Amino acid sequence: MSKTHELPAVSLPSKLESVIDPEKVLSNKYNYPEFNWNPDIHEQKALARVREMFLNIELSHATASDPKLLQTEGIIPPSDLTDRQDWRSQTGKLDESLGLDHCTFLHWGALHPTGNGRYIFPVEARDILLSPEIIVTPYDIHSTMCTYMMNTDDIRALDEEGQRRLNEYLKTIVPGKDWVDIIARRALRRMQCADDKSVFKVRSHSDLGEIKHLGAISPASLHEPIDIHDQQTMYSKWLSLLENNGLAVSYITNMLEFGSTEDKTALQASLDKSRKLWRKILDIAQKS
């Protein structure tokens, strides 16, 4: 009888696998405080609702390259762009030393300007986030190891402080499936404790993590690109996230907290829809 070969729970670049075992990545979720919480049966049902609602939030990939290239070839990892002068990449030597140049990078719910390029490609989230080719960290490695990014091509040469920072970063790597659970738990707990239970507020483009996909992403997975200078399209996307997913991107969060009375009034109808979404979820969590 032939043996059944199960798909791997997580796939890592070979260089990254040399410094962290895949089994360790699978257990890293317990490094997050969200997994110190033991939800009761009603909260578990509410978490399932949040998880589904957030899986309907598109991923995004911002690019400074010609969008027609991505529409033809998909999102290509930097390792495959060595001789391609028509593409743009922000990959550093430290990324390469960890094999991250074999990954394509996305954000979740960050359909707004991020400084990574003029065009944003929305990408269907569910199949990609839940695939074994996805790993996630809460932030870009550059944010904690910026002084090492461009001059470190061998992680064995890191000084003591660099090694400490790298080890802390490695502890945050989780599979996409676990990241979805972490964010769902974070959102529900925050909304349970918040005075304002109308919307889950995001404050930066990286609040929902840096998504790393091993290998290229097919052009079939990409939606039409958005020009960040097209304010009407951007704003309609933000309102859609508010109304259908109960989430405020950082631009909407700033308008709600620091905007004019006129700005807040314009958002009220969308905010009411978001409040109803969360009210249903919180009611499920509070049942006894």
Predicted regions and their residues:
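Active-site-proximal loop/hinge segments that shape catalytic or ion-binding/gating pockets
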Residues: 7-105, 110-288
